[in-house]
Amino acid sequence: MLAFLGSLLAFVLASRIIPVIIYTVRVKNLMDEPGDRSAHSDKTPTLGGVGMFAAFVVSLILFGIVVGLERPDLVKLLSLTLSTIILMFLGIKDDLIALAARKKFLGQLISTAIVIFLTDVRITSFEGLLGVGELPYLVSVLFTIFVFILVINAFNLIDGIDGLAGAIGIISSLSFGLFFLLNKDYLMVLVSFSLIGAISAFLRYNLSGTRKLFMGDSGSMVIGYLLAYQGIRFLELNLSGSSLFTINNGPVLLLAILSFPLLDTLRVFIIRAKERRSPFDADCNHIHHRLLILGFSHKQATIMLSIVSVLAIELAYLLKDLEINLQLFTVTLIIPLIYYLLFNSTRIRENAIKLNEVRAVKDKRSAVDLGFKKYVPSLIVRKTFVEESGHSQKAVVNGANRREKAELSEKRIKELEKSKMHLVVSKKIKKKNKSSKLK
């Protein structure tokens, strides 16, 4: 009941707050401008994370008081609230005026240090994974900081298409929340389900056609932080002898729950390293960008990646009785293989082309954007963005008549050049005739 009420209150509050944010952002013209890497073509309100955060915090504090949390849990609640406030304002500033990477890193470091040193929330053991057991205190603190910052930024990186960050956030938080519910950890139940309620309300607008809103860094960094916090609490509660429900493969299950953002981050970092670029350079090599290039819409890509995430969690849970290192090997082998098959399946590519053609027929603006509607009325096109040579982006046209488009466009250019030359020549002749008559 507590989980349901906390989630419901956060949902209702966020549903009330977000329309006010949309109105304010439009009036103040604080819109997200489409750029080379953008998967959207129109100005869109951002700062959706502010509405989610406000609803989450109010729900968390209110039910924390109602439940009557003990002093240690109240300290955890207040430290968690303080650290997320820092991240939210950091995200707002980055949404409005882009922050330098070092300033964002410093803010993330401070937020992480608050919960580690005030509440001693840290990873204390690998539970035998890779032959590592209990960690020394300093190693434990440093590794926990690394995990927090990794998950925050990994989650920030997947916030590239409509619904994706929110959907993965709900799946991950629900996975942790069910574990906390079985163990009657009421503070963490509130954290998990209040976050689910706030994200669910945001998705109503993020997936809307007329009242669209982006969460921005103010949302993605806070969600990533809260998921990292839940993940570490999950590991520590699973290790404690007082747990009512335990899982003997905690670290592997945690990796599976966060597999999509972590795998996507690792993938783009490897690609950038191969191209001798900074791992923090922005590009369009993310998994969700690849699905858009295949022809899937934002919603279709989000649904596909969400299904894969659920399958990864289910796989890790089913393998729980195996030796932990064998589990790790199996999970790290099968999950990337699923994504590889997703990109290279001929059937998926064919279906993507069909879906792309149907959608392009319904949306004639794609043809207008590329400037071929007047000259190539039968052409079915859709504009997406892809990185070329790791540095520049170009519009990629998917459709049945690519050659026809290229030939006709070249022909049209030549015709225009010829007509322009004829016009210049005729003007010169007329000018010459006039001058001869005057003489």
Show where each model-derived region lies.
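Alpha-helical transmembrane segments
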Residues: M1-N29, F53-F89, A165-L294, H298-K373, ...
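Juxtamembrane helix-capping/reentrant segments at transmembrane boundaries
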Residues: E33-L47
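Short aromatic-rich membrane-water interface segments that cap or initiate transmembrane helices
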Residues: D42-P45, G131-V141, I247-L254
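Hydrophobic alpha-helical hairpins/lids featuring a short glycine-rich hinge
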Residues: L78-I110, V115
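Membrane interface segments of multi-pass transport proteins and intramembrane proteases
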Residues: D95, A100, F126-L135, F296
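Function-critical hydrophobic alpha-helical transmembrane segments in multi-pass membrane proteins
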Residues: T144-F155, L164-A165
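Long, low-complexity, intrinsically disordered cytosolic termini of multi-pass membrane proteins
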Residues: A352-K439
